Amino acid sequence: MLPFRRILLRRGPLTGRAALFSPAFRTLGGVSREYASKPAKPAARNNTGPGFAMIFALAIIGTVIFNETAKNLDKNKPRNTFTEEEYEHVMQGLKRRVAMFPDGQLDVQFSLQKDSTQLKKLLGDSKLYIDPGQVVENYRSDREDPYEPLLNEVYSKYGPEYLKYLPQGLLVSLLGRYMKAHCRQGDHVVILDFPHSIKDAIKFENEVSSASKLLVPKESLDSDVCKYYQTVQKSQQL
């Protein structure tokens, strides 16, 4: 190998061989390969990710959403205690609430008995007996009434038993409307087969009229409504 290298060195002037690798020669196209060139640097990455300002803004928005969600969860939790200020606020709201018939205008009695015939034998015919089923049916049959579409929708779904599936509070609202149109000061009113729940009882007494008594047949003595009125000493067994 050594003699071979010497022969190559003697074939031409050193300057001629160096010219082959000169920049000028490569520029003119004499040689296409660049032996001494450095590898090209990779193109800079396109950093299109979110900047710091965007990340900071998203963090703030997330914190706000979390706080609002926590507040809503707290509101939905049952309240077992109230501060003195909250208690006074609630009591003031109750005092400002005015029933449709203030105390003393009507004598209203609830009855868990459905049959008005038996009640009339006990209480007489002078009282105004109101059947909630008939009241609701009258509004369902009135095409001009704003509740007619809703009542017929519930009726088409549940049939004759639809009274049990009315939206919460609707029965009390319809009874209040009926009594406003048909009751006069001094009337003695008996509402048959009502209330169906303690919620209905409280809503009625807050928004329509207070009730002086709950008439209870023997088979309904264990109902929640009966027990509720027993605590306030307003129940009477039939």
Curated annotation (Swiss-Prot):
Membrane topology: Single-pass membrane protein
Transit peptide: 1-35
GO CC annotation terms, alphabetical: mitochondrial membrane
Keyword Transit peptide applies: yes
Cellular compartment(s): Mitochondrion membrane
Major localisation: mitochondrion
Keywords: Membrane, Mitochondrion, Transit peptide, Transmembrane, Transmembrane helix
Transmembrane segments: 49-65
Presence of keyword Transcription regulation: no
UniProt family annotation: Belongs to the AIM36 family.
Protein name: Altered inheritance of mitochondria protein 36, mitochondrial
Source species: Zygosaccharomyces rouxii (strain ATCC 2623 / CBS 732 / NBRC 1130 / NCYC 568 / NRRL Y-229)
Designated gene of the protein: AIM36
